[in-house]
């Protein structure tokens, strides 16, 4: 008799994806973040669903409804803070996941990589529209400033902005449509994540050595299910520490003030996970140039498979490229810091240098380092 998981149509899909999946025997803890992202997504959808039951997407009551959730709903404060900090956790895992992909050359699986970039764009869009929903000062002005960037698009820009707003300014209709988008996008992300997995399982995972491991693969269960479970427990411990002890650490105090179109906050800035892109946007004096740089700062990831010049896939044995990789990480940290600072000297010049360095490392230095390392291998 055939085992049910190998014969039942639905169980077979689960079996091929999570139980009998052939997996490289040497993948490290850095490969845990894919499953942790799945956990974050489930967590966000569940907490978001319960928040949506009590939230009202109307400009007059949105702020009050969030207050009502925190004060009057059973464990509403916990659900709200889990959802708000869950977004930060999501992006931490996302950035580590992308970093691991760059370090170990996972971008050579182009279909999986490109769907991943699309997932990143969708996650950023979801987080942006979600940040508008509490209708605090930073929500309102963040929505105004970021959507206004689209007016830089020649010819159709202004019409496009007014079409997104549903009027001549960010108002009731904007909030309603942002709520609708924030509700539907996570389900689109879930569907795309499944396609992401589908393409990954066509090729199999890469490994730290960057060499084929077909001859020594092991089944996913029990080896990596236990490893993923450990990662999930550690992540949840870290997450609950953040939620229960430092719930407002990553938020903006301005968002505890109800939105007021007549009073502009002294310094408008997005959530911390967008600050690096915001710094790149601000470092270019031209509005259209800034918007192009902002989009390209994420889209540049799609060029990685074509900029790979080395004969080795992974950076494990490439000290020159390793140095550049960590320089890129340091540069992103500097950009994140600059994005949260006011537009004044010396921050302006630091932001401009860091932005130039960001694109230079990816587009010029890393491909050059690959070629130099190829030469060194011949010696």
From Swiss-Prot:
CDD domains, per database record: cytochrome_b_C (cd00290), Cytochrome_b_N (cd00284)
InterPro entries found in the cross-reference section: Cyt_b/b6_C, Cyt_b/b6_C_sf, Cyt_b/b6_N, Cytb/b6-like_sf, Cytochrome_b, Cytochrome_b_C_euk/bac, Cytochrome_b_N_euk/bac, Di-haem_cyt_TM
GO cellular component: mitochondrial inner membrane; respiratory chain complex III
Function: Component of the ubiquinol-cytochrome c reductase complex (complex III or cytochrome b-c1 complex) that is part of the mitochondrial respiratory chain. The b-c1 complex mediates electron transfer from ubiquinol to cytochrome c. Contributes to the generation of a proton gradient across the mitochondrial membrane that is then used for ATP synthesis.
Other notes: Heme 1 (or BL or b562) is low-potential and absorbs at about 562 nm, and heme 2 (or BH or b566) is high-potential and absorbs at about 566 nm.
Annotated heme b b562 binding sites: 83, 182
UniProt similarity note: Belongs to the cytochrome b family.
Binding-site residues for a ubiquinone, renumbered to this chain: 201
GO biological process: mitochondrial electron transport, ubiquinol to cytochrome c
Compartment(s): Mitochondrion inner membrane
Presence of keyword Transmembrane helix: yes
Regions crossing the membrane: 33-53, 77-98, 113-133, 178-198, 226-246, 288-308, 320-340, 347-367
Biological source species: Cratogeomys zinseri (Zinser's pocket gopher)
Keywords on record: Electron transport, Heme, Iron, Membrane, Metal-binding, Mitochondrion, Mitochondrion inner membrane, Respiratory chain, Transmembrane, Transmembrane helix, Transport, Ubiquinone
Membrane-related topology note: Multi-pass membrane protein
Cofactor binding note from Swiss-Prot or TrEMBL: Binds 2 heme b groups non-covalently.
Gene3D superfamilies in the record: Cytochrome Bc1 Complex, Chain C
GO molecular function: metal ion binding; ubiquinol-cytochrome-c reductase activity
Name assigned to this protein: Cytochrome b
